[in-house]
Regions:
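Glycine- and other small-residue-rich loops at beta-strand/loop junctions that grip anionic moieties
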Residues: 10, 32, 52-56, 80, ...
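Generic hydrophobic alpha-helical scaffold/packing signal
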Residues: 22, 68, 92, 114, ...
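Short secondary-structure boundary/capping segments
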Residues: 47-51, 91-94, 120-122
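C-terminal or mid-to-C-terminal helical accessory/interaction module adjacent to the motor/catalytic core
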Residues: 99-172
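Phosphate-handling DNA/RNA-contact segment within nucleic-acid enzymes
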Residues: 1-70, 74, 87-88
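Acidic, metal-coordinating catalytic cores used for nucleic-acid/nucleotide bond scission
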Residues: 38, 59, 79-88, 106-111
Length: 172
């Protein structure tokens, strides 16, 4: 399903299911970005039609600019494993630069969107999406779990990384 980058096939510009999701994205002004194509298919089968996925492991700047044409908000909904969370973090820089509002849905371990929907149902998944924290809340929580909040060094790292994230936004 996930072909390599070639001169003919530019993964950084392809968004899986954008053709099927465009109307729903325009209507809701929001797009759910899943990590993989099977997660996107599971969302569509569950009636969540504003779901798409990037080609490759993270959303690119080109893909963020395409999504900006249709949506005001992006909800990242990547897998709960380490690779999924790292892909979400890699996507954030380009999303911040795009000017889109960003929220990050955290899927409980050991799930991905597909398995979460199968086990808990579409309504539980929609609730997870609706309650997804904003980007800065997600980042602060992530940094607090990554760095020692009981040491000055850890708190300084958190402050510096939060500052760096704020500086990447297009807001003055």
């Amino acid at each position: 399903i996930n072909s390599p980058e070639t001169p003919i096939f530019s993964k950084r510009r392809v968004i899986y299911s954008i053709d099927k999701s465009k109307r729903s994205i325009l209507d809701t002004k929001s797009v759910i970005v899943c990590e993989g194509q099977l997660d996107t298919i599971a969302c569509h089968l569950a009636g969540i039609e504003n779901a798409v996925s990037p080609q490759g492991t993270a959303l690119t700047g080109d893909q963020a600019r395409i999504l900006k044409r249709y949506a005001e908000e992006v909800v990242l909904c990547f897998d709960s494993d380490t690779a999924g969370q790292q892909a979400a973090l890699r996507s954030l820089d380009d999303l911040l630069a795009s000017g889109l509002a960003i929220r990050v849905a955290v899927i409980p371990k050991p799930h991905d969107p597909d398995s979460f929907i199968r086990e808990n149902g579409a309504e539980s998944f929609k609730q997870l999406i609706d309650e997804a924290p904003g980007f800065f809340d997600f980042l602060l929580s992530h940094l607090c779990h990554t760095h020692d909040t009981n040491s000055d060094r850890g708190r300084i790292k958190i402050v510096h990384e939060m500052r760096d994230a704020v500086q990447k936004t297009d807001n003055p």
